[in-house]
Curated annotation (Swiss-Prot):
Keywords: Repeat, WD repeat. It comes from Dictyostelium discoideum (Social amoeba). This is BEACH domain-containing protein lvsF. Residues 389-697 form the BEACH domain. WD repeats lie at residues 858-897, 900-939, 942-980, 992-1031, 1034-1074, 1076-1110, 1119-1154. Residues 289-384 form the BEACH-type PH domain. The lineage of its organism: Eukaryota, Amoebozoa, Evosea, Eumycetozoa, Dictyostelia. Residues 145-158 have a biased composition (Pro residues). Residues 779-788, 795-822 have a biased composition (Low complexity).
Length: 1154
């Protein structure tokens, strides 16, 4: 985002032409054209001359006067001003003619003429900073010319606009040089006619003979440039401190290049820049600390909107420095602590992978461009892998998605993050961040965010919102020949012109640069919000989206506004400033005679600030939260290109997509430049960052619930820390007393105690600050979420459920299926099972402060599964020792023990009334055990190999997995005597896996189940249609655990190598991390995740995506001596606090509770 004023000084690099380089500036005096040189002297103006590659600028010290730009292409000559004939006839004269006898003395013989001396122009291949040849060595073999006739001074012409009255020489010319040899009589005669120069007597003066001068920034205002035409007038200057010939030689080179073809000129100037860069090295005296060790120094350029500034990059062991090749910036040398760099992203620039953007902890950023991809990658690896210790974790993308889903990150911040990740940056107008149109109502007097009609349909691109216009686009699409790339939209939703269309009032310099010194036609200017919306809704040439400035929250500071994606300093940025003509810019008059001034706002907005505030509220509304993932699919996701883009009516011109053309392969400079210009004009589609449907945001009720749990955990953490702090203080006090009593005997002990106490205090202080900050952030988010109405919550929940089903390709007969479920539940009201249902009814709350209660040795081998009864008094467990055990915690004894078969028992499911247990065994069978009878009541041969996992849902569906690679779906029944039976023939038998099935789980609504295989694949099945929905490769090793979150929208998967992933039911990865050791089991309530490994327990928050350390939860370290192979978390019905059961490899069960 841009600040209101780009620079504190008037001249900035945006005043130059595209592709122009700034070289140097010098203190100078300008002598305005006047009738006499004495008058010019009296009117002299102090300022600075700025030498650039395509023009020379003069910036007066008086800000009321305009900056003057002299393009080299409009100059006829540059040279030293010696006298009135300094800008006399050109050095390159016409074809020589005999000297007229009337000029020569008839009484004297005709002298032998001396050929004139001409200045040799530098060779195009010579370095621009090489020393020019001396005048004495520059001669031209020209025969005796006819001497020119002196031309009388013509009357002073009038410029096309108001300007100082100039004296004009009508003859075009080039520099005239004086020969070091004795002049000929002819030249002597000419010199006698030259008038002495008053200015030349005052010092070294040079002139610029130009036919055009461009004036800008008069009174420091950003008005359109004034182009003044002259008849080759002499503009005279002098330098204050530098030798004149040094600067003139360089300017003459640029003047010579201005007459060449653009491609050749650009190449020559590029050589000059490279030559200068090679001669400039970093000034090591500017190091912040002279003890810093230089690691890497190389050439690069700093990129900002419409500007490229070459310079030198130095990386030390402590800081990163950028030294521009010029001194245009107020603080020429920039240095950044490596510790302040929090993110480094590789960028494209000019369609090449040569950019690198660095983000700092104060919210600022630095965009650097390198000569090639190899150099860019070298710098990236050096910073990310070796020097910058505060770089965010590689799984940051998943962490952001998780936080957004849970409401910790706002929609605004998440969209900024996705833009950033997709290569969009505030430093490059060709890749500026893109935001969606949200509101569709710009006529009502009040903005009703509770009406769906108020919002734009986010599931469709802008071009598809109007069906009539879409039909036009589709007709054109079908008319494009098959051998040509097809597209729906010939224009894009984001281009530099569109960005400045919105921001012209805030950064007019950029519009003037883009439009060659003029503002756009008044009828095309940004005039009214409603008018612009109607245009993007109806015009066949306008499908532009919005920019972040429309939604910037009022509480946002510059340090937090862009996720490190900002441009210049915008501490004084006022929301909505881009909608007001605060500089009184002359933007023009429309055809309807309306003057363009401030933007006309919709009736429901009282001011620009109110307008931005209401748009931000709309962006954060529940409707947008539940539908924003559709727009993300269009812009950043799987509907961005290819067949999905065609189906979504979201296909743009092929050159807008990344990778559509290899710009490096175009060797012809004309074609390459044309291609770059074409793509920049068409716009660039963001980098595709999602290949699968983007997960939906959690409903507001669930977000609030997770935030409440997180807040409760943080508060308990702080209480725990304060308790520890108090204990430390008490210990210190006791130690002090002991010191007083036993000062001579306990010195060593006291020192150790004080040292430990200081360490504890430092740790505690750090944790207090971190937790207080977290509480403040979550409290503010929680309060913001609570402002929405309950009706809106209910509506969003129903919409969320529908969206989830539709996004997975389910048929639109969910009502029939739901009715069938209701009937099944009515008939078998008492047949429900532990698992998702019980966890869904009660969240665990905090697990941070569990404490070890007792250990029970029940089995001889690894415990494969275990559950705790509803009343928290009975433990059920099965083991690889082939035994089922039932243990009474109240009686502290084993109630049942049954050896079902000769092989291991892998899993079991428990009925809610706890009267029946369904067990899977390695002997290929599925058993139903009656707790009351203490015997097997039913069994069936389930698979052709070991049954590895079972899952039973309350709609009488049992799913089983096996080592034979199959997954089977069974229907269960309750017999007249209350016993459970399983149909002998499965209703579905899936053999989609190539390896054994390791884990199975069913969503809470009973519509989907997932199976994980030992080769790392995850299979999604529809329980309604009994069909495979999708197959995803999750890991490269054995997938050991699957667990649906209670809301049914996400699946937790774990690999034996310690990797854990949270995946949306649409198949997108939401969050991932890795723990130490091999994972064997896990459990979750959707907010917390507890994992059992061969090194004990791990605890993670699924709200913030952070690990709960054992410093806060001591029970985690207490479990580290055990290899945990099964676990179960339940709620104690009497205390309403969680109880954790863990089963070990040795066959023992541990109980943890608060």
């Amino acid at each position: 985002m841009f600040s209101k004023n780009i620079n504190k000084v008037r001249f900035n690099l945006t005043l130059m032409d595209e592709g122009e380089y700034y070289f140097d500036d010098y203190s100078a005096i300008f002598y305005p054209p006047s009738n006499t040189e004495e008058e010019s002297w009296q009117k002299r103006i102090a300022g600075r001359i700025l030498v650039c590659s395509s023009s020379m600028f003069f910036e007066p010290d008086d800000s009321k006067l305009p900056i003057m730009k002299f393009p080299y292409k409009d100059m006829s000559s540059i040279g030293a001003w010696l006298n009135s004939l300094s800008s006399a006839p050109p050095a390159h004269l016409p074809t020589p003619q005999p000297i007229p006898q009337s000029i020569l003395s008839p009484s004297k013989p005709t002298p032998t003429p001396t050929p004139p001396i001409v200045v040799e122009q530098p060779s195009p291949t010579r370095s621009a900073f090489s020393r020019l040849l001396s005048f004495s060595s520059l001669t031209s073999k020209v025969t005796t010319p006819t001497p020119p006739t002196p031309t009388p001074t013509p009357p002073t012409p009038q410029p096309t606009s108001i300007a100082p009255t100039p004296t004009i020489a009508t003859n075009p010319y080039t520099s005239f040089s004086v020969s070091p040899n004795p002049p000929s009589p002819l030249l002597s005669q000419l010199f006698e006619q030259a008038k002495p120069s008053f200015l030349a007597s005052k010092g070294d003066i040079f002139y610029v003979k130009s036919s055009q001068v461009i004036e800008m920034k008069e009174n420091s205002r950003n008005h359109p440039y004034i182009f003044k035409q002259y008849n080759n007038i002499d503009f005279k200057f002098s330098f204050n401190y530098v030798k004149q010939n040094i600067v003139l030689d360089v300017m003459k080179v640029f003047h010579n290049y201005s007459g060449k073809e653009k491609i050749q000129r650009d190449e020559l100037i590029k050589q000059m820049v490279e030559d200068r860069e090679n001669k400039i090295f970093f000034d090591i005296t500017q190091l912040v600390d002279m003890n810093e060790r230089n690691i890497l120094e190389l050439k690069c350029s700093k990129i900002s909107p419409l500007v490229e500034n070459p310079g030198r990059l130095l990386i030390t062991n402590a800081r990163l420095y950028f030294q521009p090749m010029n001194n245009i910036e107020e603080n020429r040398l920039k240095n950044y602590s490596l510790q302040s760099i929090i993110r480094v992203l590789q960028r494209r620039h000019s369609l090449r992978e040569i950019g690198l953007e660095l983000f700092f902890d104060d919210g600022s950023s630095l965009f650097l461009k390198f000569n090639n991809t190899i150099t860019r990658n070298q710098v990236y690896d050096l910073l990310v892998k070796h020097l910058c210790t505060n770089i965010m974790h590689i799984n940051e993308q998943a962490n952001y998605l998780l936080k957004w889903q849970n409401g910790i990150i706002s929609n605004y911040d998440y969209l900024l993050y996705l833009n950033n990740l997709a290569g969009r940056t505030f430093n490059d107008l060709t890749q500026y961040p893109v935001f969606p149109w949200i509101i569709a109502d710009y006529q009502s007097t009040t903005l009703d965010l509770n009406r769906n009609e108020t919002f734009r349909d986010l599931s469709k691109p802008i071009g598809a919102l109007n069906p009539t216009r879409l039909a036009t686009f589709q007709d054109r699409y079908h008319q494009i020949p098959d051998d040509q790339p097809k597209f729906l939209y010939g224009t894009h939703y984001s281009t530099p012109a569109y960005v400045l269309y919105f921001l012209v009032r805030q950064v007019p310099e950029y519009m003037l640069r883009l439009q060659n010194g003029r503002f756009d036609s008044p009828n095309r200017m940004f005039y009214s919000i409603e008018e612009t919306w109607n245009s993007v809704l109806n015009s066949t040439t306008d499908v532009k989206e919005l920019i972040p400035e429309f939604y910037k929250p009022s509480f946002e500071s510059s340090s937090s506004s862009r996720n490190g994606g900002g441009g210049d300093d915008d501490d004084n940025f006022e929301n909505g400033i881009f909608l007001t003509n605060s500089e009184n810019l002359p933007l023009g008059i429309r055809q309807d005679n309306n003057v363009i001034n401030d933007i006309i706002l919709p009736p429901w907005a009282s001011s620009p600030k109110d307008f931005i505030s209401k748009l931000h509220q709309a962006l954060e509304s529940e409707y947008v939260s539940q539908n924003l993932h559709h727009w993300i699919d269009l812009i950043f996701g799987y509907k961005q290109k290819g067949e999905e883009a065609v189906r979504a009516n979201n296909l743009f011109y092929h050159l807008t997509y990344e990778g559509s053309i290899d710009i490096e392969s175009i060797t012809n400079p004309f074609e390459r430049e044309g291609m770059e210009a074409q793509i920049n004009e068409f716009g660039q589609t963001p980098r595709q960052i999602f290949k699968t449907p983007h997960p939906q945001r959690l409903p507001q009720q669930l977000r609030n619930q997770n935030l409440k749990i997180e807040l409760s955990d943080l508060e308990q953490n702080i209480n725990f820390i304060f308790d520890e702090l108090n204990n430390c203080n008490i210990n210190e006090l006791n130690n002090d007393n002991d010191n007083n009593l036993n000062n001579n005997n306990n010195n060593n002990n006291n020192n150790n105690s004080n040292s430990n106490s200081n360490l504890n205090n430092n740790y505690i202080d750090s944790n207090i600050n971190n937790n207080i900050n977290n509480i403040e952030n979550i409290n503010s988010l929680n309060n913001e979420n609570n402002e929405n109405s309950n009706d809106k919550k209910n509506n969003s929940n129903s919409n969320s459920s529908d969206n989830i089903k539709n996004s997975n390709g389910f048929e639109n007969n969910d009502n029939n299926f739901n009715n069938e479920n209701e009937n099944l539940n009515d008939e078998n009201e008492n047949l429900t099972f532990l698992g998702e249902e019980r966890n869904n009814s009660n969240n665990w709350g905090s697990l941070n402060f569990l404490k070890f209660n007792q250990n029970i040795k029940l089995h001889k081998d690894k415990i494969s599964a275990l559950y705790l009864s509803n009343n928290s008094e009975t433990i059920y467990s099965v083991s690889l020792d082939s035994c089922l055990k039932i243990y009474s915690l109240k009686e502290k004894r084993q109630i049942r023990s049954l050896n079902l078969c000769n092989l291991a028992l892998s899993s079991f499911q428990l009925s809610k009334d706890e009267k029946y247990i369904i067990i899977g065994s390695w002997d290929n069978n599925i058993y139903v055990y009656s707790v009351g009878n203490g015997s097997i009541s039913y069994s069936i041969p389930g698979h052709s190999d070991a049954v590895s996992c079972l899952k039973l849902h309350n709609n009488n569906i049992l799913v089983s997995g096996s080592w034979d690679s199959s997954v089977k779906v069974w229907r269960t029944h309750r017999q007249s005597n209350g016993a459970i039976s399983i149909e002998k023939t499965p209703i579905a038998d899936f053999v989609d896996s190539d390896t054994e099935i390791r884990s199975i789980d069913i969503s809470s609504n009973g519509t989907i189940f997932c199976a994980g295989s030992s080769d790392g694949y995850l299979y999604f099945y529809d329980l309604l249609t009994l069909q495979l929905i999708r197959r995803i490769s999750c890991f490269f090793d054995e997938l050991v655990c699957i667990k649906f979150t209670p809301d049914g929208s996400r699946i937790i998967t774990a690999c034996i190598d310690g990797s854990v992933k949270l995946i949306g039911i649409e198949g997108s990865e939401i969050f991932s991390f890795k723990v130490k050791g091999e994972i064997h089991c896990l459990d979750s309530d959707g907010s917390s995740l507890i994992i059992g490994t061969d090194r004990g327990l791990c605890l993670w928050s699924l709200t913030t995506g952070t690990e709960i350390k054992d410093s806060i939860s001591p029970f985690l370290s207490q479990s580290s001596n055990e290899s945990i192979h099964s676990l179960n978390v339940s709620i104690n019905q009497s205390s309403n606090k969680p109880i954790l059961l863990t089963g070990t490899e040795a066959g023992s069960i541990s109980i943890w509770q608060q």
